[in-house]
């Protein structure tokens, strides 16, 4: 492609149509060059150079070249000579004195032409004095002016501006530094102070391009350094740090350039909508979401490196330059370390290189001394150097292994040491498997954090079980955790539970073997290694069983108890499970999940104490529930005969699957009904089992489950569990466990309206129309293949169906309608939403009351996939 230099544009070419054509040709050329993997630095700089030439030519065309004491100045990122495809082109039209009206009108025409060309131009028209006044009052303006670069016009006017900007009175170096530090803190806070955001902003997120800019702004203000290279020449950063920053900037620039050629409007957010295409542009390919995950892994690792360098260099700048090298007196800890203020520092300049195991000593001191808040900047620099020069992982050093296990056994390590070890790259330097999960993301809405960040948060959540104030939120764990004798085993299981992710295959199986080998290598006994590896292998077992299996079925409890083996394993597992859920996504943990896990924990505990050879006597449980419910009903004034007549209508399963309190609540209201042929809808006034219980009694009718679910969906409620039963005389006795959109029980003020609407649709007898809503934008970029599997079960009468699909609006109602269309009876439903995925379990029987035949299973699978495909495409 032949490109014409803007300087050679003839006057007749300077019109909107032809200029747009030339700009489009240039952008297409740059896109082609980028996709052919030309260096992004060249493209970013050449784009700014092209814009320089274009603005010069237009400046000349409008006759500004002949006007004295006026300058066209590039500021901000454009002033640095850097432009991405959608970057703002910030310019300043500078003069010595206020411009006459005629000239202002001409400048307005100039700016309008730039806008008509769809260039993202930000402009200001100011005198030198105005720049000085506004710049002193506004940090952003001062920063932009600091990067000012003359494009064309009066050199004298521009130099007058530079003289003002470079003067100490404009922004003293220390004042500027403090202001920039505060600005960065506020920016980081907007992104939750983490480099790990699911849809990160390439420019502004912690560790992003702005963190590099902040370093350069501070150095430019103090030294006058105009580039990263000059910063290294002034000693602000070492040659190795300079090379690392350049490398990181190049990676971030490539991602940003790829994003910009994909977008129509300026944005720096790497959203789900564009991650796959950006990954493809950058050459990351793989099955499914593998390409995206590979790209994001490198991206997150880059953010970590920039954030670490930014923090260290700014602290060094503060200590060595702003404070003139003055520091507090050192307090000696031992021969290797001392404490200076709240920071620990090495006493020897090459300590970590000479004896790498002393790195772990430093973290033991941090765990021991609550007054130590961090590591001194020079020691951070030494640690980074030593880390790069390690020729083997730290775990291969016997002394390091002893110190690592001492940390695992230290009561304060969870609170302070491990998160800092991760942040400073020590866990990755210790354990090769950990280095593989750093920055490992999962392309979904469920896992809010990368694998490494999630694992660190899991450790922090385990630590919260030590504090009594968390008992109401985590009653079982706060009761169990203090009596766990070897907490280091739980810590190791937490470190290894997801360590196999990103390598293909079952991450639990991969982690199981690696955890066992690690434990043996670190001197643990075989039974201890076996416990840790079992926890890693089965870390999802309790969560899956509680949320996706029928935990009111004695066979399910017995099978789970067999896998758990004994109470010790159960106590370790419940702590790991709860911490894992809480560390996956802050919005996941709610009272409903707490109740499910508590019921599973205590049912399993009873089964283990009773002995697995002594299973639950179903008849005894039914008898117990009936006796307790009857006693409660008789207290309310009902006779034994009234109760008996009502209960003769119910099947035994009703008394097995409800507590005596539920039975009494249902029956009290049924016995008070004047006409028991009409529907009855009850809503629990208090949250029960962590949610709102909706009980429906009604003559059976086609698609009743779908009707009730559709009505609840219309009110934006989510069904998480359903028990579907019929009486001997054809009445339904259905119980729905319902939460609102925020995972909480339904507000009492809405109960009467919900009761009224469900009663109305049941009396009407016609299936409720499923409310059609657009699939939320955040779900549109995920592809969840609909899967229908039929699980093995001991039951000869019932079929277990596991169902996975994209969690689109009205999904459960559509599934229920399909069951009704095929004459399939639903007995129970367990509804689990995992990010964008619905993972549900249904217990079904055929119209004849038995298990579904293979033909019926095939037909059901085909109909569900067909119906959901139609709704998604619609």
Curated annotation (Swiss-Prot):
Q: How is its activity regulated?
A: Uridylyltransferase (UTase) activity is inhibited by glutamine, while glutamine activates uridylyl-removing (UR) activity.
Q: Where is the HD domain?
A: 451-573
Which Enzyme Commission number(s) are listed? Answer: 2.7.7.59, 3.1.4.-
The organism's superkingdom is given as Bacteria
Q: Which InterPro entries does the record cross-reference, listed alphabetically?
A: ACT-like_dom_sf, ACT_dom, HD/PDEase_dom, HD_domain, NT_sf, PII_UdlTrfase/GS_AdlTrfase, Polymerase_NTP_transf_dom, UTase/UR
The segments labelled Uridylyl-removing in the record are 333-692
Entry's Gene Ontology BP terms:
regulation of nitrogen utilization
**What domain notes does the record hold?**
Has four distinct domains: an N-terminal nucleotidyltransferase (NT) domain responsible for UTase activity, a central HD domain that encodes UR activity, and two C-terminal ACT domains that seem to have a role in glutamine sensing.
Recorded protein name is Bifunctional uridylyltransferase/uridylyl-removing enzyme
Its gene is glnD
């Amino acid at each position: 492609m032949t490109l014409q230099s803007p300087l050679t544009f003839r006057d007749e070419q300077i019109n909107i149509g032809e200029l747009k054509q030339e700009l489009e040709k240039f952008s297409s050329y740059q896109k082609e060059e980028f996709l052919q993997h030309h260096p992004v630095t060249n493209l970013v700089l050449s784009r700014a150079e092209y814009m320089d030439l274009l603005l010069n030519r237009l400046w000349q065309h409008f006759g500004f070249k002949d006007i004295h004491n006026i300058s066209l100045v590039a500021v901000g990122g454009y002033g640095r000579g850097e432009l991405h495809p959608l970057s703002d082109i910030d310019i300043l039209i500078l003069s010595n004195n206020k411009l006459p009206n005629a000239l202002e009108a001409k400048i307005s025409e100039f700016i309008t032409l730039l806008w008509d060309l769809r260039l993202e131009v930000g402009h200001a028209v100011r005198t030198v004095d105005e720049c000085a006044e506004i710049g002193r009052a506004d940090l952003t303006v001062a920063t932009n002016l600091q990067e000012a670069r003359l494009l064309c016009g009066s050199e004298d006017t521009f130099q007058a501006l530079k003289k003002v900007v470079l003067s100490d009175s404009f922004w003293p170096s220390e004042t500027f530094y403090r202001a920039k530090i505060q600005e960065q803190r506020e920016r980081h806070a907007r992104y939750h102070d983490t480099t790990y955001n699911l849809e990160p902003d390439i420019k502004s997120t912690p560790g992003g391009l702005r963190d590099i800019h902040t370093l350069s702004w501070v150095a430019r203000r103090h030294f006058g350094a105009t580039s990263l290279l000059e910063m290294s020449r002034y000693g602000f950063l070492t040659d190795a740090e300079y090379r690392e920053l350049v490398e990181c900037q190049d990676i971030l620039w490539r991602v940003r350039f790829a994003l910009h050629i994909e977008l129509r409007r300026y944005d720096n957010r790497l959203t789900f909508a564009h991650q796959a295409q950006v990954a493809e542009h950058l050459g990351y390919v793989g099955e499914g979401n593998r390409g995206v995950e590979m790209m994001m892994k490198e991206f997150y690792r880059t953010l970590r490196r920039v954030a670490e360098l930014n923090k260290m260099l700014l602290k060094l700048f503060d200590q060595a330059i702003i404070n003139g090298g003055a520091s507090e007196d050192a307090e000696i800890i031992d021969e290797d370390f001392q404490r200076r203020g709240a920071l620990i520092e090495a006493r020897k300049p090459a300590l970590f290189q000479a004896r790498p195991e002393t790195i772990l000593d430093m973290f033991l001191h941090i765990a021991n001394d609550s007054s130590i808040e961090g590591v001194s900047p020079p020691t951070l620099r030494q640690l980074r150097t030593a880390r790069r020069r390690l020729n083997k992982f730290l775990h291969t050093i016997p002394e390091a292994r002893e110190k690592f296990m001492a940390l695992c056994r230290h009561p304060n390590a969870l609170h302070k040491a491990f998160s800092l070890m991760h942040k400073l790259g020590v866990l990755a330097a210790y354990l090769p498997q950990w280095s593989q999960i750093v920055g490992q993301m999962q392309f979904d809405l469920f896992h809010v954090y990368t694998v490494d960040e999630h694992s660190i948060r899991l450790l922090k959540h385990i630590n919260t079980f030590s504090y009594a104030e968390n008992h109401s939120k985590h009653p079982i764990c706060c009761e169990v955790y203090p009596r766990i004798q070897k907490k280091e085993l739980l810590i190791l299981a937490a470190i290894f539970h997801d360590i196999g992710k990103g390598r293909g295959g079952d991450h639990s199986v991969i982690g199981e073997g690696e955890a066992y080998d690690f434990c043996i290598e670190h001197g643990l006994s075989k039974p201890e290694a076996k416990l840790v590896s079992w926890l890693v292998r089965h870390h999802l077992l309790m969560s899956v069983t509680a949320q996706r299996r029928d935990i009111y079925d004695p066979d399910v409890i017995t099978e789970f108890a067999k896998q758990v083996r004994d109470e010790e394993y159960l106590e370790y597992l419940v702590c790991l499970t709860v911490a894992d859920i809480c560390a996956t996504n802050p919005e996941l943990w709610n009272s409903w999940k707490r109740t499910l896990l508590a019921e599973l924990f205590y049912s399993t505990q009873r089964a283990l104490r009773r002995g697995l050879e002594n299973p639950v006597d179903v008849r005894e449980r039914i008898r117990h529930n009936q006796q307790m419910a009857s006693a409660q009903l008789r207290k309310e004034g009902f006779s034994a005969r009234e109760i008996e007549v009502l209960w003769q209508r119910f099947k035994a399963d009703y008394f097995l699957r409800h507590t005596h309190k539920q039975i009494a609540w249902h029956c009290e209201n049924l016995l008070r009904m004047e006409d028991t042929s009409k529907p009855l809808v009850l809503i629990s006034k208090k949250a029960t089992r962590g949610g709102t219980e909706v009980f429906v009694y009604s003559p059976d009718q086609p698609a009743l489950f779908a009707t009730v679910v559709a009505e609840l969906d219309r009110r934006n409620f989510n069904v998480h569990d359903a028990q579907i039963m019929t009486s001997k005389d054809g009445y339904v006795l259905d119980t729905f466990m319902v939460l609102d959109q925020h995972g909480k029980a339904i507000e009492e003020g809405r109960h009467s309206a919900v009761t009224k609407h469900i009663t109305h649709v049941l009396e009407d007898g016609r299936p409720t129309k499923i409310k059609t809503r657009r699939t939320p934008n955040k779900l549109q970029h995920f592809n969840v293949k609909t899967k229908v599997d039929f699980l093995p079960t001991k039951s000869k009468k019932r079929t277990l169906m596991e169902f996975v699909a994209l969690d689109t609006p009205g999904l459960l109602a559509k599934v229920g309608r399909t069951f009704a269309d095929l004459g399939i009876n639903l007995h129970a439903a367990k509804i689990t939403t995992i990010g964008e995925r619905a993972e549900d379990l249904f217990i079904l029987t055929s119209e004849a009351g038995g298990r579904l035949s293979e033909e019926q299973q095939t037909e059901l699978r085909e109909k569900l996939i067909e119906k959901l495909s139609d709704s998604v495409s619609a």
